[in-house]
Amino acid sequence: MASEPYADRDDPRHFRRNGYLPIVSSSTYTTTSFTVSRSLRCFPSVLLVLVLAGCAGVKVTAVSNNDYLAQRRGDVLTTGNLSASAVAALQVVGSDEKRCLADLPACREALDSTTGLRDEQRLSTLAELWLKEAQDGGKVMAAEARTDAYLESARYAYAYLFLTTRTPSQRALEDRQTQVRDYYNFSVQQALVEVFDRYRGRPPSPEDTQGNFRLKTGRWTIGGRMTDVRLADDRLLPKELIPAASLSFGGLRNQYRRDGLGAELVAVTAKRVVSKGSDEIPWSETPFPAITAVARFPGETLEQVLSTYQVEVIGYDPYRQDSVDMAGVQAPLAANFTSGYGLWLARSGFARQSLLTLVGRGEVLERPHVYLLQPFDPDRRIVVMLHGLASSPEAWINVANEVLGDEELRRNYQIWQVYYPTNLPLAVNNQAIREAIEQTLANFDPQGTAKASHDMVLVGHSMGGVLSRLMLSSSGDQLWDAMLGSYGMQGARLEKARAKLG
């Protein structure tokens, strides 16, 4: 095509036809211009790039309250999966939950050697991974290997709690510390229960008269003592340990416990409360005392604790102690105050025995018997509970449990429950119950100087209420003088009556 005259190019219609845009000055059109035909053809591609660049890589979705709590607090103990904190730590070493669980030794080694994690992150994650291994092993894993894994978990949890830069009080409101505390408590519980299961009926022999013991399991040497817990029949070690968390009781309105450090256990020294020997002495200590066990790992530094395969286990009476020293830190002692009492009731056989006694068919309990619900404490006053007609100590199920569960009452009182045959006359039971209580006190406090031997509290229901009143009353010689006046007894007859009636 022939080129058009330049004059025609000054016509705006020319620019519109040929794809040019004029730049207009105040007086005339200039010759400055640029071609846009190619730009217009590229415009769709540019627009697509801009739209794609506007799509965010992160999408926001609403999370329900339940899912929020599960994400924040879910871990190997609650969901069976690793916690969000553990997963985040694994990402630092270039791993994830699936790959880590496929090769746990390599995963733990990577966590242990990395410099990209703080001590708290590394120790808490290793505690969770060892616990995961112990739980997933189940019956397939050898018993000693499983116990080793639980002790490893307890060791790393112990190091996290007491041997890192921050103290437990500085992490008091953190969810992760609560999780790691639970790893420690659960791992100590499972390790001890498994060890005692292996020695069921034949517990490890004490090394001395103080109840110190030592045994070997896998790579670990477990030493410990139970001197802070009084066991029935002067036993130094229990026959069996039952996790308090595994017990659930129907008939009890509430179950009382205290949060803290340690494995909540029931130390079993006998199968039943009432046995053929129950009538030989007028009192019985509970064969199911509640105890709390803690594990200490020797060493003053993190490196020393992580390199040892020794552990010291100590049992405490949670009624007498509410805190424990751990690596220089005073930690609250965990406790379950309902577990021992609930198991005592469940294995007592009182209901059947009370009905048999009422109709004269009782064979084991034919006279009053005092039952101590806790190991004797000379520094706490005694509450004696007396049941009513055709009843038994089971009548006090929830009353006794509420006393045990109240911190103020628990700190100042201990409970004794009295079983007595309700088919006997009140006067006979009154005298027999008095004697049983006096003999019990004489056994535990021969000098009669302890606080527990004074200002005893009597609580009675129905016939037990009448007996409580009689035990607090004294007629002096009035009844004796009235009998002498009515019957005029003298000489041998009088002496015989005096010997018989006391």
Regions found by a protein language model. Name each.
Residues 368-408:
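Short, surface-exposed "cap/lid" segments of acyl-processing enzymes
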Residues 96-107:
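Helix-turn-helix repeat elements of alpha-solenoid scaffolds
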Residues 74-91, 120-133:
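Amphipathic alpha-helical repeat scaffolds of TPR domains
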Residues 282-378:
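Non-catalytic propeptide/linker segments at domain boundaries
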Residues 112, 131-205, 383-389, 418-423, ...:
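Serine-dependent carboxylesterase/thioesterase catalytic core
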